[in-house]
Amino acid sequence: MLLGVNIDHIAVLREARQVNDPDILMGMYAAIIGGADQITTHLREDRRHINENDVKDIINHSRVPVNLECSINEEIIDFVCKFRPHRATLVPEKREELTTEGGLNLSTAGLENIINRLKNEGIKVSLFIDTSRENIDIASELAVDCIELHTGTYANIFNMLNSNIALTKYSIKNYEKSREDLQNLLKDELANIKHLAAYAKGLGLKVAAGHGLNYQNVASLTKNSEIFELNIGQSIIARAIFVGMKTAVCEMKELIK
């Protein structure tokens, strides 16, 4: 299974003090040395962390494929077409959200035209989608190269079941349930992800997954799964604070191999 390392949170740390440190390219190089198969980054409309110069540098200097997450905003798509990353993953975006909260609405007007424009530029296209067969069917009809299944629900249930988050201010209200209920929900969500990955592969789609994945919850996703790639960011950057980026990526690679 391949690992895409999302390096956005290096820029989050930089922007916290609005200085030029840490260097996004140094982080990228360390991730690649650690075994990253792909560099993933998200150019948001509000440029809250990664900016255009970062993306240009990443595309120009990465020796592994670059997966650029982006909204379908016209200005952003113009930029993507100009600098041509290996892949563009189309995601929904809200200014007020801390991170991407759900999958892309595949009935959005103009989506097919944007996909075709990107493909005409030689850019592979992926759609970040919620876990439903209907979304996969639509993605197949749109003739994209890849889908990325939103694993946020799985990650949230896992976290509430297997950590102390329920006892903190970060408790996830929707999953304040009994341990037995959480175990059943987790089993069902994991089975659903694996079933949908197999279904999508049967339609000729490559299947990636991501959102909320960490060193504790990835192992279950890798067993008997048709998912070919995981995109993971915050947990790797957080681990890197203590062990360094190279080691943090190596450890994740070991877990998903």
Swiss-Prot record:
Keyword Cell membrane: no
Gene3D superfamilies: Aldolase class I
Assigned EC number: 2.6.99.2
Molecular function per GO: pyridoxine 5'-phosphate synthase activity
GO cellular component: cytosol
Single biological process term from Gene Ontology: pyridoxine biosynthetic process
Record HAMAP family: PdxJ (MF_00279)
Subunit description: Homooctamer; tetramer of dimers.
Name this polypeptide is given: Pyridoxine 5'-phosphate synthase
The organism of origin for this protein: Campylobacter hominis (strain ATCC BAA-381 / DSM 21671 / CCUG 45161 / LMG 19568 / NCTC 13146 / CH001A)
Gene label: pdxJ
